[in-house]
UniProtKB/Swiss-Prot annotation:
This is Cytosolic carboxypeptidase 2. Keywords: Carboxypeptidase, Cell projection, Cytoplasm, Cytoskeleton, Hydrolase, Metal-binding, Metalloprotease, Protease, Zinc. It comes from Mus musculus (Mouse). Interacts with RARRES1, KIF11 and MAPRE1. Disruption phenotype: AGBL2 and AGBL3 double mutants are viable and display no obvious phenotypic alterations.
C-alpha cells in the first residue's frame, strides 16, 4: 500500500510549472521523502507548523510522502496521535467551509486565516530550525580554527548531585609552596605543537579543526610499570598547553592563553590517564594571571572519574588537599604570574579522570539540550528556536522565543519582554547552568511557568560566545577581545554575536516594552550570587532598579547576597551589555554574577555550589519575576520601603566614618547614590578592549603606518589607586600653570592640600557664566559630574575655584558639590564648620543649605 502511495505521489503533476520542476527535482535529494527512520519526530513538528489552530488556504499542506495531501483522512491515518480534538474540529471546519478557495492566485503555502470569516490572511511562521534533524546527534558539529588539533573522541559527563555538602578547604598555614623548576629540570610529558598566540589572528575554521593526522602528544609508556600520567586537552573547552613532570608524582601545568592573545588564564579543563590508586599526586598550575582567587579562601578544584561514573554513577566532585594560591617566583620581566597547587589521590588504578575549574558546559551540551526541546511536541509549541547569527568561526548563535500563543493580536502586543543571555565569557560555565535551570522551569508545565509564558515574551540567548566555549577560552572571542566590552560596536563582521544581539533588542524595544534584561556571568573573587545594576537619576524611578535584586535575595537567602550587589555605572563599564541596554531605555538591566566557589550564607554557609544549586537559581529568577510583576504591589512597596531604610543606614555609616552626625529626615534622598557606593570589583578587561586583532594586524602591514607603530603604547597603571594619584598630580600641575597669569589663584592652590572639605558659596556663578568669564576653563576642565559621569570626583574641580575664596578661609576643596535641581530655591548660604548633633544648625530661613562631605552631598531645606 505504501509503495502504491509513493508511486502515485512521485507521478503527481502540479499545475504550476515551477513548483512541478522543483517537486520532481528535489525528491531525489530526500527532501520530500523524509524517511521516518531518520526523522523520529519531524512529522510532529511539521504537524504543529501546519495544524496550529489556524485555518489555512488550499494547498498549504506540504507535499512530502509523510504528509500526503490528497485527503485529510490520509493525514489523520498517518498521524492519529498527533492531532488533538481541536485539530480535528478545525479540519472539519475547513472541509465544510466554502472559503477554502481553489483559485490559482490564492494557492499558496504561506498564507493562513486566523478566522473562517476573516478576509485578510497573514503569513505563517517559518518551519522549526530542528524539524529535519535527528535527535540522535547534535544539529551542527562544532567548527574550530584551522590551527587547532582536535581528537576524535566524544567527551561526555553525567550530571550528579553529591549526597553530602562539599565544604570549603580550611587552610592550615602549613601548606607546601613548591618552587617552580620548569622543563629545564623536569620532563615534558605533554605539549601542544602549534598554539595561536599574540601577533596572529583568526582566518578560517572547519569542522574538526586542523587537517591531517592527529599527533600523539602524550609520552609513550615504556611498559605496564610506567606510572607517567597521560595528559590530553584537545577537546571542547579544554585548554592545557603543557605538562612537565618534576617528580615521581608531581607535575607542573601550563594553561593555554585565550587564542590570539597572551592573557586570560583562569579556566582549566584537561584529562589524565594511567592513574595509580594509592599515590598522592601534586599538580601545580604555574601561569595564572589574577592576583586574587577563591582558591586562597577555600575553593577546591573539580575532579571526575570515568570509572566512578560508570560503576557508581558518581559525577563531578570537589577534590584537593594542601591547596595554595601564591605568586610565581619566576621573574621574566613580563606581568606577574600566580600559581595554584593541590594534592589529590585517584580512586582507581588505570582510570581516566578529568580536572576542571568549574562544571564544564560545552557547545555540544547546549545543542543536545536545544534539540531535545525542539523534538518535544509540547515544548516546541511555545518555544521557537532560531539562529540569531553565525559566529566568526561559523557556529550558530541560537535565539529562543518563549511565550504562549495569544488569543488576539491585541493580547500579543500587550505582552512585555524579558531578555536573558549567558556565556559571553566562555570560561564562566556557571552561567550556562543557571540558564539551564531557567529553561527547565520556563519550559515546564507548572502553573507558574504557564503564567509567565502568558504574560511575557522571553528572548533567550543561551550562549553568546560559542567559539570561545569550543576552543576553551576564558574571556575572549576569536577576535581576541572581550565581547562584553563591545556592545557599542559597529563592527558587525568582527563582533557578530554582540551586534546582532543588540540589534535584536533594539527592534524588540520598538514593538514592546522590555521589562528586564539580565546577562549571566561568573565571578572568580567573590562567593555567593549577586547582581550589578544601573542606578537611575530619574526621581520617578528612584531605587526601583534595586527592588528585583532585593526580592531575589529573599527568595534565595542561602545563595543570593544583596549586600554584594552594586548599582554604580563606571566609565570602564560603558561597553558592557548591562550599561548599554540601560542607556537604551531598559531600567531593570542587570549582570548576574555567580561565584565559582560557594555560599557564605544561611544553611549553605561554607559549602561549594553544585549544579543543582545553580539550576535552582534559574527557578528563583522566574519566581522573583512573578513577585516583581504581581498586580498586588504589597511586596514591591515593602521592598521599596526597606531599600530606603537600608540607604539611610548606609548614609549614617558614611557620616560616622567622617566623624559627623546628622538628622537626614526629609532630605537624605537627594544624595547621589553613586557617591555612596564603592566601585565594583569586576574583572578588568581594559587590556582586551580596542579593535579586533585582525584589524590591528592589517594596520601593522601598511608601510605608511610603521612610524606610528614605533611609538610605544603608554603603559597602563595596574590599580585604580595609581590612576587616581596620577590624575590628581596632573591636575595640580594644571592648576599651578593657571596661576601664572592669575595671582589671585595662588592662595587657592596653596590651600588645596590642607583640608578635605569646602562649602558652596552663594556668590558662585553658574558653570556657563564662569566659562564665558574665564575662557581658560575649557570643556575638559568642566567635565565630570556635569556631563553625567559616575566616576568619583577628583581631589578638587576647576569649577570650584571661585567658591574657595569665600569669607571663611578655613574651608578648602575636596570635591565638586552636586547642584540642586530645584531652580526655585535660592543659593545655599555659608555654613559654619561646627556640626549639630541633631539637625544642621546652619539652616537659615528661606534658603536651601547644602553640607558637603568628601564624595557625599546632602541638601537640607527649611
Amino acid at each position: 500500500m505504501n509503495v502504491l502511495l509513493e508511486m502515485a505521489f512521485l507521478s503527481q503533476t502540479l499545475p504550476d510549472p515551477y513548483e512541478d520542476f522543483i517537486h520532481h527535482h528535489l525528491q531525489y535529494y530526500g527532501y520530500f521523502k523524509a524517511q521516518k527512520s531518520s526523522l523520529p519526530n519531524s512529522g510532529t513538528h511539521q504537524r504543529v507548523w501546519r495544524n496550529s489552530p489556524r485555518y489555512m488556504l488550499n494547498g498549504s499542506f506540504g507535499e512530502r510522502d509523510d504528509f500526503i495531501s490528497d485527503s485529510l483522512e490520509k493525514e489523520m491515518l498517518l498521524w492519529p496521535t498527533c492531532l488533538s480534538s481541536t485539530g480535528h474540529a478545525h479540519i472539519d471546519a475547513v472541509n465544510r467551509d466554502s472559503l477554502l478557495l481553489s483559485s490559482p492566485l490564492l494557492r499558496t503555502r504561506q498564507l493562513i486565516f486566523d478566522e473562517l470569516d476573516e478576509a485578510s490572511p497573514r503569513l505563517r511562521e517559518p518551519r522549526e530550525l530542528f524539524s529535519c534533524f535527528s535527535s540522535r546527534g547534535p544539529l551542527q558539529a562544532p567548527r574550530w580554527p584551522i590551527e587547532c588539533e582536535v581528537i576524535k573522541e566524544n567527551i561526555h559527563h553525567i550530571e550528579w548531585v553529591p549526597h553530602q555538602p562539599e565544604y570549603f578547604y580550611q587552610p592550615t598555614g602549613s601548606e607546601k609552596v613548591p618552587e617552580i623548576v620548569g622543563e629545564e629540570q623536569g620532563t615534558v610529558v605533554y605539549q601542544l605543537d602549534s598554539v595561536p598566540a599574540e601577533g596572529t589572528y583568526f582566518t578560517s575554521s572547519r569542522i574538526g579543526g586542523k587537517r591531517g593526522t592527529i599527533k600523539e602528544l602524550a609520552v609513550t609508556l615504556q611498559g605496564p610499570d610506567d606510572n607517567t600520567l597521560l595528559f590530553e586537552s584537545r577537546f571542547e573547552s579544554g585548554n592545557l598547553q603543557k605538562a612537565v613532570r618534576v617528580g615521581i608524582y608531581e607535575y607542573e601545568l601550563t594553561l593555554r592563553t585565550d587564542l590570539y592573545t597572551d592573557k586570560h588564564t583562569q579556566w582549566f579543563y584537561f584529562r589524565v590517564q594511567n592513574t595509580r590508586k594509592d599515590a598522592t599526586y601534586r599538580f601545580t598550575i604555574v601561569n595564572l594571571l589574577k592576583p586574587k582567587s577563591l582558591y586562597a579562601v577555600g575553593m577546591k578544584p573539580l575532579m571526575y572519574s570515568q570509572l566512578d561514573a560508570t560503576i557508581y554513577n558518581i559525577g563531578w566532585r570537589r577534590e584537593g588537599r594542601e591547596i595554595k594560591y601564591y605568586k610565581n617566583n619566576v621573574d621574566d620581566g613580563q606581568q606577574p604570574l600566580y600559581c595554584l597547587t593541590w594534592t589529590t589521590q585517584f580512586p582507581h588504578d588505570q582510570d581516566t579522570c578529568f580536572f576542571a575549574h568549574f562544571y564544564p558546559y560545552t557547545y555540544t551540551d547546549l545543542q543536545c539540550y536545544l534539540l531535545s526541546v525542539a523534538n518535544n511536541p509540547i515544548q516546541s509549541q511555545f518555544c521557537k528556536l532560531r539562529a540569531l547569527c553565525r559566529s566568526l568561526a561559523g557556529n550558530t548563535v541560537y535565539l529562543l522565543t518563549i511565550t504562549n500563543p495569544s488569543r488576539t493580536p491585541q493580547e500579543a502586543a500587550a505582552k512585555k519582554a524579558v531578555v536573558l543571555s549567558a556565556r559571553v565569557h566562555p570560561g564562566e560555565s556557571n552561567s550556562s547552568w543557571i540558564m539551564n535551570g531557567f529553561l527547565d522551569f520556563i519550559l515546564s508545565n507548572s502553573p507558574d511557568a504557564q503564567l509567565l509564558r502568558d504574560i511575557f515574551v522571553f528572548k533567550v540567548i543561551p550562549m553568546l560566545n560559542p567559539d570561545g566555549v569550543i576552543v576553551g577560552n576564558y574571556r575572549c572571542s576569536l577576535a581576541g577581545r572581550d565581547l562584553n566590552r563591545h556592545y557599542k560596536t559597529v563592527l558587525k563582521d568582527s563582533f557578530p554575536c554582540i551586534w546582532y544581539t543588540k540589534n535584536m533588542i533594539k527592534r524588540l524595544l520598538e514593538e514592546r516594552e522590555v521589562l528586564l534584561y539580565c546577562d549571566f556571568h561568573g565571578h572568580s573573587r567573590k562567593n555567593n550570587i549577586f547582581l550589578y545594576g544601573c542606578h537611575s537619576n530619574n526621581r520617578k524611578h528612584w531605587l526601583h532598579e534595586r527592588v528585583f535584586p532585593l526580592m531575589l535575595s529573599k527568595n534565595a537567602p542561602d545563595k543570593f547576597s544583596f549586600d554584594s550587589c552594586n548599582f554604580k555605572v563606571q566609565k570602564c563599564k560603558e561597553g558592557t551589555g548591562r550599561v548599554v541596554m540601560w542607556r537604551m531605555g531598559i531600567i531593570n538591566s542587570y549582570t548576574m554574577e555567580s561565584t565559582f566557589g560557594g555560599s557564605t550564607l544561611g544553611s549553605k554557609r561554607d559549602t561549594h555550589f553544585t549544579i543543582e544549586d545553580l539550576k535552582s537559581l534559574g527557578y528563583h529568577v522566574c519566581d522573583t519575576l512573578l513577585d516583581f510583576c504581581d498586580p498586588d504591589q504589597t511586596k514591591y512597596t515593602q521592598c521599596l520601603q526597606e531599600l530606603k531604610e537600608l540607604l539611610q543606614q548606609e548614609i549614617n555609616k558614611k557620616l560616622n566614618n567622617f566623624g559627623q552626625d546628622m538628622d537626614l529626615e526629609g532630605n537624605w534622598s537627594d544624595i547621589p547614590l553613586s557617591d555612596i557606593e564603592s566601585s565594583t570589583s569586576g574583572s578588568d578587561s581594559s587590556l582586551s578592549d580596542g579593535p579586533p586583532i585582525r584589524l590591528l594586524n592589517i594596520v601593522a602591514d601598511e608601510p605608511n603606518q610603521k612610524t606610528v607603530l614605533k611609538n610605544p603604547k603608554k603603559k597602563r597603571l595596574q590599580t585604580r589607586k595609581q590612576r587616581n594619584e596620577q590624575y590628581q598630580k596632573s591636575y595640580l600641575m594644571r592648576e599651578l600653570k593657571l596661576t601664572e597669569n592669575a595671582p589671585g589663584r595662588a592662595r587657592f592652590v596653596s590651600t588645596l592640600q590642607k583640608q578635605p572639605t569646602f562649602l558652596k558659596s552663594p556668590e558662585s556663578p553658574s558653570p556657563s557664566v564662569r566659562r564665558s568669564e574665564n575662557p581658560r576653563l575649557n570643556e575638559t576642565q568642566l567635565s565630570g559630574r556635569e556631563k553625567g559621569t559616575s566616576l568619583d570626583p577628583p581631589l578638587t574641580s576647576p569649577k570650584n575655584k571661585e567658591r574657595i575664596q569665600s569669607k571663611k578661609p578655613g574651608f578648602t576643596a575636596s570635591c565638586s558639590p552636586k547642584r540642586s535641581t530645584n531652580s526655585s530655591l535660592g543659593p545655599a548660604p555659608d555654613v559654619k564648620p561646627n556640626w549639630s548633633k541633631t539637625r544642621y544648625s546652619a539652616t537659615r530661613k528661606d534658603h536651601a543649605t547644602m553640607a558637603v562631605y568628601p564624595s557625599l552631598h546632602i541638601y537640607t531645606y527649611p
